Every structure is written in structure tokens, then in C-alpha cells.
Amino acid sequence: MNFTPTKNIIFLLFFLSSCTVTIIRKKPANKPYLTGNKIELIGGEFNKVERQAVLLRLNNYLDDSSKVYVKDAFFILRTIKKPIAYDTSYSGKSALNMQSSMYHLGYYNAKATYTQDTSNKKVTVKYTITAGKPTLIDTFRYRLKKPELQQIAMASKKESYILQNTPVTKVAILAEINRLVDSFRNNGYYKFTAAELRMRGDSTIAALTTITDDPFEQLRLLNEAQQKRDSPTIKLALDIIKPEDSTKINKYYINKIYILSDFRPDDVFIDTSFITQRTTKNFILRYHERLLRNNLFSRNITMRSGDVYKQEEYFKTINNLTRLGVWQSINIRIVENRDEADKIDLIIELLPAKKFIFENSLEVSYSSTSNTTAALGGNLFGLSANFSLKNKNIGKQAISMTHNLRAGVELNNGSRTNSNNLIFSNELSYTNNVVIPIIPQKIIKLFKYKTGESFINSGVGYNNRLNLFSLQSLNENVGFTGITKKDHRITIRVLNADFSYLYNQSQTFKILLDQNPFLRYSYNTSFTIGMALNYASVFRNPNHPLSISKERSFKFNGEESGLTWGLLPILKQYKKRFVKLDVEYKYTVSKRKTAIAYRAFAGVGIPLFKDTALPFFKQFNGGGSNSMRGWPVRGIGRGAQKLIPYSANNQNIFNDRTGDIQLETNIEFRHNIARIVPDLITLKGAAFIDIGNIWNINDPSQNSTNEITKFEFKNLYKQIGLSAGYGFRFDFSYLILRTDFSFRFKRPESSDVNNGWEAPPIGFKDAFQKIFSKNQREWRYENFNFTVGINYPF
């Protein structure tokens, strides 16, 4: 294998990435101008990550007239447009800004200086920040003059952001003040604001204020003073300031709760002429037309008459009502009671939304598979029409029902079959989704849900693959989904049933089954019925020191068939028994112009009893725009299974591969390239690597020649696939159009030679021809894949 062409391309990419060219446009005439700033941070108790974060922070404190605006493009081009004529006064302002910013980090002895290189008209300024020692918190206490406020603060002191022997920072102080404001508002003090609190500090050195005639005591105090200069400390106390409006520190209770269930903007609260009013134990309900039942409000409004006002219940009520989807806008007004100084009335104004929503859409696709779950898809041009009707309020209980009708056709382009039929397949499907905004109390307690809903999903579909087969499908899902107190999403499907009936099999399809025996164990009439569990959690850290955001997500899916509901004697001859599990982990660090994204996926399906493989609609597959991008959809695996030889008309090629086990990991480096249309379209790029494969868990044919498709740990390294490539992303803000060019570097089908490592034979001279020429289809079939997708792959 000749690796030289590929090595040349890789070397060129590394060489270009190490070189930069700076272009300066519209520079000032006959004046020195600023082309760059350098910032050096000396000292300070920072680790490597914190030091880099501080340097980024200091850069943001440059005065506007000291900033150099650089536009990067294609890794190597840097453009400076209209550089500013250099003025030393702006550098002085920048140095003062940086010194002040260090105070916010607890470095009150920090010093900032600057020097400039003016040897020619291109000026570079170097800022030197000497951090010194941070001022540490010696003690911290609350001095709130109102006993109840003092008690609330002390009860939650363990949650304080002000910690002993840590630097006193502006961020920590503001966070502590905001935390206490929330605590007070959750205990009846709804008018309390941050303006009523002040953080005070005392850093007095005793040696400078204590008078003594004892020389030994004087030496001790002087030594203490020197130590405090070397390791400065501060004593903090949080005081309450008496506000001009004394009611700001009053505690309030809820008097009456008014619900205006079909509020109109021109309604006058005191005018009830054309309003129906009903009084319940906790609410006063007013409406022009009764849209909802009373128990719906009791379940979703968590505040009650006579309760202490709590801010968290205020927002929880808004979120609960918003989640129902019945109202266009939701507003809760707080009105102080004139007769009782410590009472407030709540007026909940609910502006109704449209009860019915009708939507329609037309989809156009060019894909390796059909738009349905059916098998045997080729490279097809598809058209699909979708119609949707949603009723948001059934039975006056905010129960929503959505009807979806889909009709589609796939046109044969002749690239994967020599059939002369224009229409390759057609489909028709109907789904009905019912969402009920309530779940059983036992489920709430079991999973500690804070919000949740029940669902009933039903579907029926018909797909006709001309000259191959027909497929009818039925599915039913009943269960619950909700968000836990830790913001984890858990979905339980207590009934998870799918029935796929394969019939009208043509002679052509039967020949395919004979030529590919493994298909018989996947493509057949199947009935699955059981339960399923889905778990998802997302952790976002918007305050990561070196990035705009940092996000981790974890998903787990588990389902079974034949162990619970499957014990019922229904459709025994078609019933499939299995357990299927998969986990997915994603990690993304986003910076201003770049991002790194990582994904890991593992899934396994275990056939039970006499079954040898999962049903085809439950199996795993790899390839395509969101998986192993070096292979087409369902184009990689199983194990080390060989590629079917290429033929000019692709006659008899069937390369769809699905399996019971999938392992995959992906990593992608994303970066901005250029703005095509400001504030509308941005061109971005991404370099990526995909690693993975699929396998069978058994050898269903009991044929030793097919053992290469079976998963075995000893063959894992040999049979793993690897592809790498580069893609472009056209970011339209509301969606991302993605194109990826991916090459195969490790091929499972060649695992018996060099463990599958084989770089694609491509060089500078023939790269364009091999990627785009019609005469190189066989080369692309064996080495390369081009995909188009919407939004990011993971």
C-alpha cells in the first residue's frame, strides 16, 4: 500500500495550520498604528486553567481604543481592518482597567504596567500584570438587624458562597447577596432586593493601631503586620441597610388568588358585569366562557390562600401553566391589600391560545434509505407530504391530541438497481398522539418527578417496495415522562408494542434472501411487546473559565420483549423475545470561535429463548450523516463481513447491514471560517474522526464461515472501523446545513491484512477526479462517502 499521497495531504494541512499571513487594510497615513497586544501575568495563586482564564478576562478589559480587531479565515489568513492610530493614553486606561479587574478576583495589591514597541509604524503593546498575594477571607458573619432575616440567613449559611481562607471576589459576594435575596423572597419578603444588603470589610492591621510599652509585644505585633502584608486577610460582614420604603422588609401572606382563565386585554378587574365568578376553597375563578375544569388549576397552581408568599412557588406555578400549552401568555400580578398591610392578592391573567393548530409540510430528500423503517433502501429521491391537526384542550382538562398523516413516494434513480420503474416505493402512515398533563402519584414518588405527563401513542403504516415486498406496521406506546428534581428526564413505557407484517414477497426479494442467508433472521414478520425505560440528563456549565459553555449529556435506553406483556398468548408464531440496552455520552466545550465535541455510544441486543437475532426494526446500524460518516447508511459491518464486489450497474448489490451490537465513538473539532452574509449566514468547518462498527451477538446461520460477523473481544481491535474527514457547515442561525467528506482509514472488511489499516489511495493530482468524477464510482464505493445533513451530527 502506497501511503505517500495521503501523507502529503496530511503534511500540507499541518504546514498550513502553522503558518499565518496578516493583511492590514485602510491603515492611518503617516501615523503609527496598533497591530497587537500582549498580556503577561506574573505571580498569583492560579493553576494552569485559571491562569489562562484570567488572561482572557484581562484581554476583555482593554479600552475600546486599544483593541485590535482581527478577522481570521481559512486557518492562515488574518485581516486587520482600519487599525487605530496609537495613543499612549488609551494604553494607560487599559492598564488601569486590568488592575481594577484584579481587585474583583481578590488581588488588591495587583499592579499593572505597559511598554510599547514603536520601532516602526506597527505598534505592539505589552501589558505586565503583577498579581501579588490574594486577600483571603478571615471570617464572615451576618449582621442583619431584623431577627427573622438573621435566622433565615443563618439557617442556610452552609450554602454560602463566602468561604473562609478563599480569595474575596466580586463574583462570590454578588452570588451570596443574590442567594440571600432569593431565600428571603421564598420566606414572604417578596419586595426585598439586593439594594437592601451591603458587604463590609475590615482589613485593619493591629500593629498599626495598638499602642504598647512592652517591646516584646511590639515585636510580636510588627511581625504579625509583616505576615499580614505577605498574606493579607479580610473580615467580612453582611449588613442590612434600612430602606426608604420600610415595606421592603415586611413579610407578606397570600390573601386571595384570582384566576382569569380566559383573560382579555380590555378586561377591567373591578368590572364583573359580563363575568362569571366562582369561589372555591383556594381560588376565585372568573371567566367569560368556561374553558377548563377547576381540578386542573388545583393541580398546577401550587400557591394557596393563607400561605406565606414564596418566590419559588410563584415561578413553579407559571411553569406548570405554561407547560399545559392552553394559553398564549401567562401573567401573575401581585397586588398589596389595602386593608391588611401584610397581605397580598394574586391575579393570574391567562390569555387563551388557539384550540386547534393545523400544519402541513413537504419534505424532499436524497438518501440511502427510505423515509420509513422498511429495509432495502437505495440512493433515492423522495417526496413526502405531512399533515398535522392538534387539539390542545380535550375534555376541558388540557389534554392534547395530535393527528399526523404522512404520504410519500421514492423515485428510482437507477443507481442501485437496474429496474426501469420510476417509482421505487410508496408509503402511507397515520399516527395519533395523546398527552395527558398528569401522572399517577405512585410514579411521582418513585422517580421523584417535579413535573410530568402521561402519553398514549398509536400508529399504523403501509409501505410498498415495488418488485420487492409490502410491509404493514402497527405500534402502540403507553407510558409516562417527567423531569425529576435534579432535572433528569425519565420516560417509562408500560406498554411498548410493535407489529410488522411482511408480505407480497417478490421472486427478486426471495433470491436476495437466498444469496444473503443472514437476512432471513432479520427480515421477517415480527411482533414485539414489552416495556421500555429511557433516561436522559444534561449538565451545562456556562461559567467554565476557558469557554463560553461546557455541556455533558448522558442517555440510557432499555427495552424488553417477551418477558412481561410478552407472556400473554398473542401472535405466538411472530413474537420476538429480547432485551436491548444502549448508552450514549456527549461532551462539548464551546468557545467563541471554536468547539470540541465528543460522543461515545454502546448498544447491545440479546435475543432470548430460541430467537437468534433481533427484529430488523430493532437492530443497530452505522454509517450515514450522523454515525460512521466514511460509510453510507447501514453500510458498515457486520464485524469483518466483506463488501459485495462493485458492478457498473450495481445489479444485485445489497449492502444494508444491521446487527445486535454497536460500539462507536466520534470526535469533532469545529471552527468558524467566514461570514458569508452578516447576521444571517456563517460558514463554519469541522474536522472529525469516527470509530466504530456493528456485530451480531450470535451466528444465526450456524455457519462457521459467518463467524466473522459475530462479536468477540479478541477481534475487537481488528474489526473496528475508522474514518476521518472534513466538513462545511452553513449556519443560518435557525438551522445548520451540513456537508461532510469522509475517507476510510481502517476497514473492518480488510481486518485480515494489517489489522484493517489502509489509507485511501488519493493524492493532489487525482483528488478532485476521484471525489467528483463519474468514472470513479467504484473507488468511492470502496474508500469514500459524502453526506448531507441538517444540524450537528451529535
Residue ranges and their predicted role:
Residues 1-36, 183, 600, 782-786, ...:
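Bacterial Sec-dependent N-terminal signal peptides
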Residues 20-323:
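Interaction-mediating elements
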Residues 23, 43, 129-133, 144-146, ...:
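Flexible glycine-/small-residue-rich
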Residues 108-115, 190-199, 328-335, 489-497, ...:
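Short beta-strand elements
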Residues 149-152, 290-291, 310-558, 629-630, ...:
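Gram-negative/organellar outer-membrane beta-barrel architecture
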Residues 362-378, 390, 493-682, 687-717, ...:
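C-terminal outer-membrane beta-barrel translocator/porin domains of Gram-negative envelope proteins
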Residues 686-688, 736-742:
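Conserved active-site loop/cleft motifs that coordinate metal ions or position small ligands
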